[in-house]
């Protein structure tokens, strides 16, 4: 889901 992608970006 989009939430997962956003989570990865925040992890960077």
Curated annotation (Swiss-Prot):
PTM sites of type Leucine amide: 6, 12
GO cellular component: extracellular region; membrane; other organism cell membrane
Ribosomal protein listed as a keyword: no
Keywords: Amidation, Antibiotic, Antimicrobial, Chemotaxis, Fungicide, G-protein coupled receptor impairing toxin, Immunity, Innate immunity, Mast cell degranulation, Membrane, Repeat, Secreted, Target cell membrane, Target membrane, Toxin
Subcellular location: Secreted; Target cell membrane
Intervals of motif Dimerization motif 1: 3-7
Motif placement: Dimerization motif 2: 7-11
Domain of life of the native organism: Eukaryota
Coiled-coil features, chain-numbered ranges: none
Tissue-by-tissue expression: Expressed by the venom gland.
GO molecular function, one term: toxin activity
Keyword Membrane belongs to the record: yes
One GO BP annotation of this record: innate immune response
Family: Belongs to the MCD family. Protonectin subfamily.
Note from the entry: Two derivatives of protonectin with substitutions of all the amino acid residues (D-prt) or the Lys residue (D-Lys-prt) with the corresponding D-amino acids have been synthesized. Both derivatives D-prt and D-Lys-prt exhibit strong antimicrobial activity against bacteria and fungi, and both of them could disrupt the integrity of membrane and lead the cell death. D-prt has similar hemolytic activity than protonectin, while D-Lys-prt has significantly lower activity.
The name this protein goes by in its record: Protonectin
Native organism: Agelaia pallipes pallipes
UniProt lineage: Eukaryota, Metazoa, Ecdysozoa, Arthropoda, Hexapoda
């Amino acid at each position: 889901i989009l939430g997962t992608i956003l989570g990865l970006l925040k992890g960077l």
